[in-house]
Amino acid sequence: MESWPGVSLVGLLLLLLLGQGPSQIHGSSGENTSQPQQVFRTLKNFSFPCKPKKLELSVLSKSVHSLRPSDIKLVAAIGNLETPPAPGSGVVNMEKPQSLESELQNVCIGIMTALSDIIRHFNPSVLMPTCSPGKGTAGHTTIAEDLWIQAKELVRHLKDNPELDFEKDWKLITVLFSNTSQCHLCSSDQQKRHLMKHMEMLSGVLDYLHREVPRAFVNLVDLSEVLTMAQQHQETGFSPAPEICKCSEEITKLSKAVMQWSYQEAWEDLLASSKFNKHETFAVVFQSFFSEVELPLERPSPQDSTTLALRIWNSMMEPVGRKDGTLNEAERKTMKCPSQESPYLFTYRNSNYQARQLKPIGKFQMKEGTKFTCPDKDPSDSIPTTVHRLRPADIKVIGAMGDSLTAGNGAGSSPGNVLDVLTQYRGLSWSVGGDETIETVTTLANILREFNPSLKGFSVGTGKENTPRASFNQAVAGAKSDGLAAQAKKLVSLMKDDKTINFQEDWKIITVFIGGNDLCGSCNNLARFSPQTFTDNIKTALDILHAEVPRAFVNMVSVIEITPLRELFNEPKVSCPRMILRSLCPCVLNLGENSAELAQLVERNRQYQEETGKLIESGRYDTRDDFTVVLQPMFENVVMPRTLEGLPDSSFFAPDCFHFNVKTHARSAIALWKNMLEPVGRKTRHQNFEIKVPIMCPNQTSPFLSTTKNSNLGHGTSMSCEEKAPSASPPTSVHTLRPADIQVVAALGDSVTAGNGISSQEGDLADVTTQYRGLSYSAGGDKFLENVTTLPNILREFNGNLTGYSVGTGDVNSASAFLNQAVPGAKAENLASQVQTLIQKMKNDTRVNFHQDWKVITVMIGASDLCDFCKDSNRYSAANFSDHLRNALDILHKEVPRALVNLVDFMNPSIIRQVFLKNPDKCPVNQTSVLCNCVLTPGEDSHELARLEAFTKSYQSSMLQLVESGRYDTREDFSVVLQPFLFNIRLPILENGNPDTSFFAPDCILLSQKFHTQLARALWANMLEPLGKKMDTLDPKELIALACPTKDKPFLRTFRNSNYTYPIKPAIENWGSDFLCTEQSPSSKVPTSVHELRPSDIKVVAAMGDFLTTATGARPSESSSLDTPWRGLSWSIGGDGTLETHTTLPNILKKFNPSILGFSTGTLENTAGLNVAEEGARAQDMPAQAQALVKKMKSTPTINIQEDWKLITLLIGNNDLCLYCEDPENYSTREYVKYIQHALDIFYEELPRVFINVVEVMELSGLLHDQGGKCAMPLAVQKNCSCLKRSQNLMAMQELKKVNGNLQSALSELSYWHRYMQREDFAVTVQPFFRNTFVPLDERGGLDLTFFSEDCFHFSVRGHAEMAIALWNNMLEPVGKKTTSNNFTYNRTKLKCPSPENPFLYTVRNSQILLDKAKENSNTLYWAVPVAAVGGLVVGILGMMLWRTVRLVQ
């Protein structure tokens, strides 16, 4: 073992036995000169931190109370450090071997030289130091005589020194003495007697110096503990000092710290009031040298004499009354400097020292009682046999183990009475004290006595653990965890021997609280106080209790968060005995702010708590039904109480500012009691002593002391439902479905339902890819409900033959996945595929009777869509999300009999954001932010974040609208129910305000088993709650009771058995759209290429075509005639209103360029703008319309025909199809294309800078279905339209369908014609959204006539809006990847947006389509019949067009 740094321990001991004769270091002092220079290197390698020049003054100080280091001319020392004589003898043997005298001389000179070297930095002319140790060869002499001789020798030497002006020069004299009997560590009375004895011994010497030496600053230095330490740690060859002052009390760490402080205070009080400090030229200051109460086991190798010199110097730099006095590792190598404000050596006067009166900051209380109001105080009807059904009144015995906080040290001490901290007020102890009653003294024992007045084992009054009044409070002051096993053995022995209790039958509460002292000493011995060792010590003690004590409930209180103690210690306005604090807890209070050592301590504190928790959670102490250990974590996060002024409130502490005051004991008792009633997993982990809370009461719902098993907050759940029977016969209606009727369970969704990362351990990021399907909240079936809470495990409590659930781990294709068909990362667009697979599995698996078994299918989707929405906001729009979800549910509705579908909302992405942002250390930001970039990367208050929130709300709204449409309530054996428990979700928060990452997988995105458990409980609760009253908020940390069906309400709830009426949607006021695009800027300069054309570059808009472009009948209710052309509402050219009220292509473009020209308004010809369409137009009219349009453009003065970019939309062919039956040759596909080509040629020759939309004609097959009598077909159509005359002729209808397809196919080739690709500023792009046109259906699946005007022929405003949206979206889709169908569903957010990556309108070239196709078709067209369409546009539309055409022709 290495020795402590500084003077060698042999040397120190020799120093303490100083030899004879004054000695001064001079260059001519013979052999005595060279030897010390060889032995002591003093401050040669020491970095001097002070800046003397800043403190220099030219005038020498006249007062000792303003004495600066630069004023000192000489350093000297005298002393006697021998053991005091035996009582009554008055003498000490001073004889020492001659060989030691030389070494003693060297040690003394070395220390004085080091001190002199320090002063030399301030005053280079300081003289060589002087040592005047005792004679040692004069035989027997008293200590007083020896000191007298030294003093006289010193004075003589000073007077004879020619370099010293004895009268004017300032001298620094150090008087060394010892108190090696350690009487200063005894009780106050003994200490005072011994102190007076020493004072008498030294008074003569000090009086002599005071009288004889002018201008002197005298240090009175007690090196008692330095000597004791030397004797304890190194063999010196000398006999240890005899114990001549045996203390009446045992010396403990606490008593030693208190007595050290008291000893120093006594010396300072004596000296401050003495005559030695009443003059201007002389002062005596006491400098104590106390060692740390616990020294490090390993210390640096011995250094030179600088250590002791530095300590003397540093003490001189500290104001009297604020000297800490202890030697500690942190200060052994540091030097303090005079400050600008206090550049002098500190005396009692310039320190403003007053006799210490320690007063607490805050209001002191001698006692603190609490009002007890719990109504239910009865015990169990019979003595319980299980600890998990233990009521407070069942407790008959109480006990405790721990340290001084449980022993009650200082709990009842009055303010300022530091010595009384040694008194153990066990009757006031928070966990086991039993003084008085709850009304005056609040303790756990007194709380329990309100339930059972016959409680035994509590401690009363004061005394140590071995006194009768301590009873079963076996806490030992100063104890560490390695002493806990001995306490456990003693407690067991006491209980067994106590005749007043029944050891075998009585229920016992034992509270264990330990660890503060371990932390306080941990930096000095990391092996002894490591977290693992600490936990092992606790385990040893708990093992003893577990093995020996029947019927016991053990509170294992987490070690307290100890660093807040620093706030009290570091606040100068708070009066605390800091020397005691540093002695008791050096490893907390001796560390620098923001130091690595402090960070290590904080981490060690946390590990103590964490490892203790793991020990308890291991289940090691839950193997017997009559014994458990419960972790009570209320001290894990402690807030320092503060006064109204914001200062640390010392009234909560004993006079030593370390132990608890009675007020804190009271509030700790209430906190412990609250913890005991709180469920495991939901216990308070935060303690604010400032707040006095009432005593919590058990209730009928939770009457028992909480254990792991009765808390229902592990991953398992207890089921206490009584109504578990199935229906008398299998129900035929989903509205009379009981839980026990469910025979099959299945699930669809993404990573959450697939179970990714559910059981992954913290930090194991790679394991997140593991799919723990058996633990999935909606589909998992691992183990049983008491171990794993999932929906299937709940349903298995009702029907043990349930099938379909997944077990273990594996992907979607594994056998263990069964009917859990969720796929990690799946999006809404993948849902239909999952549905198809699920249906096929259910049909093919023999365990499932597809037609007879009742099924619960849970669907959860959307989170993955939001993770990627910003990458392609068009693809992941709310409209598309709704469409995909509807398609999947439609398949289930159509294909699956006897099914109840749970549609579960996705978790709001803001939760994931908060977890990431507030836990950057725990969450792997760099690795996983890529997986959910659109959620995790937007800045706070950014536009991107606002868009995320808007998309989230739109997704949720679309789910609600879809279900409440009633679309899935048309069959008696099928229903979709929205389970909204995730609609509003609260972030699980720890007591310190940080998100609780234990609810999440290691990636902080997916959910842990803890969260899945809560999801399962919440889903089950929702399934039993009626519509309109379902829980729509989830706090993962709250206790969710497992609901039960009842006799009155035995069914899983649907809209019908909830007597719920879906809310009637408010009438839609307009068919406008919301504009969410952010990329709106035009090109930096006007583009010269049509392939780099942005929407904002468009200056002119125009259109040509037939009645669809004139918008005839779009708003017939506002006109007396159905023939009115509402050009201002036309899909491709109308400009009435704004986009928010009317969705048209120009209104969309106005968002990019408000100055756009050419759009139509109103109904009059003169406001048609550049809309040249005619109602009855056919393809043959297109060249004429093209000429008219060119003429209009050229004659419009506001249009720059050469520079402005123009957008022309052409749609024709409806009337051609109508007349094809009469004249197939003239209305052939070839003729149709020829006329359109001619019109395009005109534009090609006449107009620069043009982008032309050629829209394919509508797909018109599958017509003439029944319309329910709402749109009876006029007889004129049937009589005059040759096509429809043969509508019953299958061959004729096939021919019509073929021609329709040929027209579309022919137009589709136009985009690739070589002719139209020769100019850089000209492009023709075919927009195919009408190729496959779905019949518009309402929310219940019926024909939706709101798309048409009252004649069921013309498009209504809504129909035009849908066409405008479809056209715009086609324009932003690459050629070859354009949407070829129109989705007639209402959503205000269906408009796509250009993006920074793809800002241009798409042409063949910028779509990266190979130009070979265009070259192939430059001269020859190849016709192809398109694939048969999905369905017709609307019933009767072709007939009406034919009728209309005939009428016009006639």
Swiss-Prot record:
Result for mutant: D518 to A/V: Loss of PLA2, lysophospholipase and lipase activities
Post-translational modification: Undergoes proteolytic cleavage in the ileum.
Effect of H665A: Impairs PLA2, lysophospholipase and lipase activities
Segments on the Cytoplasmic side according to the record's topology features: 1444-1450
Name of the top EC class for this enzyme: hydrolase
Keyword set includes Nucleotide-binding: no
Record protein name field: Phospholipase B1, membrane-associated
Organism lineage: Eukaryota, Metazoa, Chordata, Craniata, Vertebrata
